[in-house]
Amino acid sequence: VDELEQEAIRYNPENRCYLCKHYLFGKLLEFARDHGVTQVLDGTNEDDLHVYRPGRKALREYGVISPLAACHVTKTEVKALAAKYGVSVAHRPSTPCMATRLPYGAEINYDVLDRIADGEAWLHTMFGAEENLRLRVHGDMVRLEIAPERMGEVLEKREEMIAYLKKLGFSYLTMDLEGFRSGSMDEKITQKEETK
């Protein structure tokens, strides 16, 4: 399944997450029916219920069950259970959809997604695989979100970072003084929702 073949998703509207989940789970349910599977589950957890997750609407429309959320299991508890049972990704930081690195309305393409993934992977080699960080792309500018306590280290490594990220095709490099924030591209949307 190639989500970017869908023009409505590729042009990254504010409801992109809903459109994408609707498309993906539509295909998954079609596959499930073809193979005699009557129920599909997903990994939504309790924490997801308290943040902006427009894709959950598609899951409800399709009748997808979210057992972790239903049992009030949090992301921290999921990671603890994964570690207890030796699941290899137990200590990996969360990896949300790469489209969340782009502002709404910016066209999504594999070139920019690959460059973001490359840049984030490289930064993880510098700051640790478990470090929560994001590269947010605004045209030819990239904005690094990282924990405030790591910002001094970023400045110490800036020459190396400038060289690598410019090699990836980013012309302007900035660091977000607010630090890492999950869902920072949704802040304007959630502010709009709160004022309704």
Which sequence ranges carry the predicted segments?
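ATP-dependent adenylation/pyrophosphate-handling site
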Residues: V1-D2
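Active-site adenylate/phosphate-handling loop in enzymes that bind or generate adenylated species
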Residues: E5-V89
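Short, electropositive alpha-helical surface patch
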Residues: Y52-K57, E107, Q191-K196
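Short clusters of hydrophobic/aromatic residues that line enzyme substrate/ligand-binding pockets
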Residues: C17, V64, M98, M185, ...
